Amino acid sequence: MPELPEVETTKTSLLPLLNQRVKSVQVRDSRLRWPIPEDISRLAGQRLTSLKRRSKYILAEFETDQMLWHLGMSGSFRVATAADELRKHDHLILTFDDGTELRYHDPRRFGCILWLNEESQSKLLNPLGPEPLSEDFNADYLYQKLKSKQVGIKIALMDNHVVVGVGNIYATESLFNLGIHPAQPASSLSKPQILALVQEIKRILKFAIELGGSTLRDYTNAMGENGYFQQTLLAYGRAGEMCVNCETPLENLKLGQRASVFCPQCQPLKRK
C-alpha cells in the first residue's frame, strides 16, 4: 500500500498539470472502493488549480469543484498521451487541452475518486490525527496520546487518529533504528524515547520523500519513475536475514494483521 512518502511523491509529480484545463472525462470502470461519481464529467472545462496532500489523500482543487483521491492498496496515477497503450485497470482518464492524459490505474480497486464535500470531509478527513512532518506532531503531543495506550507501539503509530501516514514500512524502520520492540506497550515508552521516536519518524519520512518513496512491487510516481528508499531498508521485508548491527537473524511478528520485522537482540521487549 502506498504510504505517505509515495503519496507525497505522486502529488509532486502531478504538479505540472496545474492550471491546465480538463477537455474531457472518461470513466472506463467506475468500480472502486466507492463508485466514481456519476457526475464527474462536470470537471470538463475546469482548470486544475491546486494539489495538496492530507494523510494519504490527494486533494485536487478545480475551478468549481474539489476532489478527494486515495490510492488504496494498488492505485496509481500516470501522466500519459493518447498514443500510450491503455492498461486493463485504467479506471479514469482526464484529458487536458494540450492532449495530456491523467489516468487512474487500480487493479485491486481499493482506491477512491470522490467529491470533496461536507460528507467526505466529515467522514474521511476530520477524524485524522496530525501530519507527522508538522509542528503539531511533537513529543508532548505523542506522550499525551500514548500514555494510556496498552497496544504495541507499532500499532499505535499506524493509527491514523494518533498520527497520519506512518505505515508499515516507515514504522518498522523507525522502531528498528531506535531499538524499540514493535510490540512494546505504547504507554511504557519514556519521554526521551518518545522524543527520539518523533525525531526519527520525521527523519525517515523526509529521507523517503527525497528518494521518491519505496518501489517494492509496482509503485511508480505519475511520470512512471521508481522510488529508491527500498534500497536503504534495514528491517522491513528482511525477516530471516541477519541484523546489520549484531548479525542476529531478524524475526517476523504479526501485529494488527500486519507483519512486523524486528531484531530480537537489538529490540528486546521490555516490561514495566
From Swiss-Prot:
GO terms for molecular function: 8-oxo-7,8-dihydroguanine DNA N-glycosylase activity; class I DNA-(apurinic or apyrimidinic site) endonuclease activity; damaged DNA binding; zinc ion binding. SUPFAM superfamilies: Glucocorticoid receptor-like (DNA-binding domain), N-terminal domain of MutM-like DNA repair proteins, S13-like H2TH domain. DNA binds at H89, R108, K149. InterPro entries: DNA_glyclase/AP_lyase_DNA-bd, Formamido-pyr_DNA_Glyclase, FPG_cat, MutM-like_N-ter, Ribosomal_uS13-like_H2TH, Znf_DNA_glyclase/AP_lyase, Znf_FPG/IleRS. Keywords: DNA damage, DNA repair, DNA-binding, Glycosidase, Hydrolase, Lyase, Metal-binding, Multifunctional enzyme, Zinc, Zinc-finger. GO terms for biological process: base-excision repair. It catalyses: Hydrolysis of DNA containing ring-opened 7-methylguanine residues, releasing 2,6-diamino-4-hydroxy-5-(N-methyl)formamidopyrimidine; 2'-deoxyribonucleotide-(2'-deoxyribose 5'-phosphate)-2'-deoxyribonucleotide-DNA = a 3'-end 2'-deoxyribonucleotide-(2,3-dehydro-2,3-deoxyribose 5'-phosphate)-DNA + a 5'-end 5'-phospho-2'-deoxyribonucleoside-DNA + H(+). It comes from the Bacteria. The active site is at P2, E3, K56, R258. Involved in base excision repair of DNA damaged by oxidation or by mutagenic agents. Acts as a DNA glycosylase that recognizes and removes damaged bases. Has a preference for oxidized purines, such as 7,8-dihydro-8-oxoguanine (8-oxoG). Has AP (apurinic/apyrimidinic) lyase activity and introduces nicks in the DNA strand. Cleaves the DNA backbone by beta-delta elimination to generate a single-strand break at the site of the removed base with both 3'- and 5'-phosphates. This is Formamidopyrimidine-DNA glycosylase. It comes from Acinetobacter baylyi (strain ATCC 33305 / BD413 / ADP1). The lineage of its organism: Bacteria, Pseudomonadati, Pseudomonadota, Gammaproteobacteria, Moraxellales.
